């Protein structure tokens, strides 16, 4: 897992305007990576696309949507020519478009694999939202397709580019917390009826696939280890009709090779909760809220030092900007992005294990 920590540090440097290798810097100074945004849902329209407005190295050059009117409206806002508006029926046409370097997949989970694989086959790099896919097999197929096509694949774990998260990893790497003994984390909210996330055919699962994955991924990176034991439980409490196809609550525990343990929960039936807490042999650290789009706050009590209380000063769309720019830098410098397809696949396999109980 050491490579991922180096990538966190590199991402932090990129956010500060540094960290580009010489060859990449020359290319980035003269061009931007052209993204084709696939799917005009909430995360695309409210977060990723606005981030490109302040990005140094990324821009929206094409749009794929099943709603022509919405696509035309967004195209006008982002300077996308009419010839670069696609439907899902003519998606393969992106292959011959030199304006498109990469795709950003902001679709429901069950559509990630198909449109990522087709993009790779069209010669485009892929930045795909988490979770990587709806199943382990689909995720593996995505990774295989991108490797076969020699295209970059990055999974959009935006929190890897969030300042409080990067600061937490830095404190751990510097030994400020000592040995990690235990972690607890939770992320959940009360979901509205009718959300596509409540449909198994679209989501692949419930809150674990949607927001619990943040807790899982954070624990792996906070420890720098892969769990050797994992146990999960799921339940439905609210019998109001929302949870006919997916679970309402999931809790799971993990044990790591060092002996560190983790306890995590995720829900679609409770008020908003979002945090992770790390208990170390020398200090305690908590980030709360941890996984929201902005407003993260890190607190730490380190023996012999003044308490740390750091609210995030870089607000949304900052993490999306750094994420888009990091992927562009990796494409231009021919470096492996972090987190890549292999990283997304690990989380998919662990979530499958949690569901198995």
Model-derived segments and spans:
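Beta-strand-loop-alpha-helix segment that lines the small-molecule cofactor/substrate pocket
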Residues: 101-102, 108-109, 113-160, 175
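N-terminal Rossmann-like dinucleotide-binding module
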Residues: 11-79
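Contiguous beta-strand/loop segments that form the cofactor/metal-binding neighborhood of enzyme cores
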Residues: 217-294, 321-335, 352-353
């Amino acid at each position: 897992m050491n490579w991922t920590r180096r990538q966190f540090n590199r991402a932090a440097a990129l956010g500060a305007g540094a960290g580009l290798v010489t060859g990449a810097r020359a290319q980035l100074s003269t061009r931007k990576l052209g993204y084709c945004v696939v799917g005009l849902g909430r995360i695309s329209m409210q977060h990723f696309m606005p981030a490109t407005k302040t990005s140094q190295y990324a821009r929206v050059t094409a749009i794929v949507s099943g709603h022509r009117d919405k696509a035309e409206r967004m195209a006008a806002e982002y300077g996308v020519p009419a010839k670069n508006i696609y439907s899902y029926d003519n998606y393969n046409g992106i292959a011959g478009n030199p304006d498109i370097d990469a795709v950003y997949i902001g679709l429901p989970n069950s559509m990630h694999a198909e449109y990522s694989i087709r993009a790779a086959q069209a010669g485009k790099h892929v930045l795909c939202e988490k979770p990587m896919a709806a199943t382990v097999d689909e995720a593996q197929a995505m990774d295989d397709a991108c490797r076969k096509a020699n295209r970059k694949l990055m999974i959009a774990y935006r929190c890897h580019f969030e300042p409080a998260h990067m600061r937490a990893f830095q404190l751990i790497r510097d030994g400020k917390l000592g040995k990690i003994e235990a972690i607890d984390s939770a992320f959940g909210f009360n979901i509205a009826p009718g959300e596509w996330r409540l449909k198994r055919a679209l989501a692949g699962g419930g809150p674990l696939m949607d927001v619990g994955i943040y807790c899982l991924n954070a624990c792996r990176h906070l420890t720098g280890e892969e769990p050797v034991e994992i146990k999960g439980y799921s339940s439905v409490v609210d019998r109001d009709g929302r949870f006919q196809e997916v679970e309402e609550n999931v809790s799971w525990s993990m044990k790591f090779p060092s002996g560190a343990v983790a306890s995590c929960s995720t829900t679609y039936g409770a008020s908003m909760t979002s945090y992770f807490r790390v208990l170390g042999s020398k200090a305690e650290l908590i980030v709360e809220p941890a996984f929201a789009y902005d407003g993260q706050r890190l607190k730490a009590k380190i023996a012999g030092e003044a308490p740390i209380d750091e609210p995030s000063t870089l607000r949304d769309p900052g993490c999306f900007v750094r994420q888009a720019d990091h992927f562009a830098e990796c494409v231009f410098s021919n470096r492996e992005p972090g987190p890549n397809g292999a990283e997304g696949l690990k989380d998919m396999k662990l979530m499958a294990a949690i569901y198995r109980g």
